[in-house]
Regions:
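C-terminal/domain-edge helix-coil "capping" segments
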Residues: 4-22, 88-91, 115-117, 125-195
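Surface-exposed short loop/turn segments
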Residues: 6, 71, 75-133, 154
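Acidic/histidine-rich, surface-exposed loop or edge segments in extracytoplasmic proteins
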Residues: 22-32, 67
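Second-shell loop/turn segments in exported
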Residues: 28-36, 72-75, 109-110, 150-157
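Solvent-exposed coil/turn segments that connect beta secondary-structure elements
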Residues: 29-31, 55, 63, 102-105, ...
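N-terminal segment of the mature soluble domain
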Residues: 33-99, 135, 166, 170-175
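Residues in flexible loops and secondary-structure boundaries
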Residues: 34, 50, 65-68, 102, ...
């Protein structure tokens, strides 16, 4: 099923709520860029957002240990290591695994203009079936203008963190809230409940 209710294209299985997803392991970021700090920033931001959406925290160091044990490499260099979802589920006792790909993280400098582009893809897979439960992809382009290259570089670096935050907020807005969600929901108002 494809949906755009949250404003961004995403796919979600129709029976997501019935799947009973509570525990989500956040796999190390598949980083297609050369910046390891970007991958860390992205993963930390997603980790916090999942918690505030009502999914309990599974410490990243425990997840990283499992990737190190099973792949033989650290989580920062686990680019080619794709553990089966079932293996992660067995080791960690989770319901689903979220995979994240940092597709693009760059700034192009053209005279007095410097566009900064950040692109991310997220995919949530079920441990029980191995199928995709939810996925979304989002890009942000932030444009900067200035007369000196130094100031353009500074503006570009200052825009990365807000871009990551926007991407995470937008993509995860289409993921249903978890069972421990603390978000306030106003009561439904209907004409017949007023009387």
């Amino acid at each position: 099923m494809v949906g755009c209710a949250s404003g961004i294209p995403h796919t979600i299985v129709p029976d997501y709520k019935e799947q009973g997803i509570r525990l989500i392991a956040l796999a190390p970021v598949h980083n297609k860029t050369n910046d390891t700090q970007a991958a860390k920033l992205l993963r930390d931001t997603i980790f916090e957002k999942l918690y505030f959406k009502g999914y309990p925290r599974i410490p990243l160091n425990i997840i990283d240990e499992k990737f190190t044990e099973d792949c033989g490499v650290s989580s920062e260099t686990a680019q080619g290591c794709t553990l089966p979802v079932e293996t992660i589920g067995k080791h960690l006792g989770v319901d689903a695994v979220m995979y994240c790909t940092l597709i693009e993280w760059k700034t192009s400098f053209i005279s007095v203009y410097a566009p900064t582009t950040v692109s991310v893809a997220l995919e949530l897979k079920s441990v029980a079936t191995g199928g995709t439960l939810w996925s979304a992809e989002y890009s942000v382009v932030d444009r900067h203008y200035d007369f000196t290259r130094k100031r353009l570089e500074l503006k570009a670096w200052q825009s990365y963190e807000p871009a990551i935050q926007e991407i995470v907020d937008e993509t995860l807005s289409s993921l249903p809230d978890g069972p421990d969600s603390v978000e306030y929901r106003p009561p439904e108002k209907s004409f017949w409940k007023i009387w």
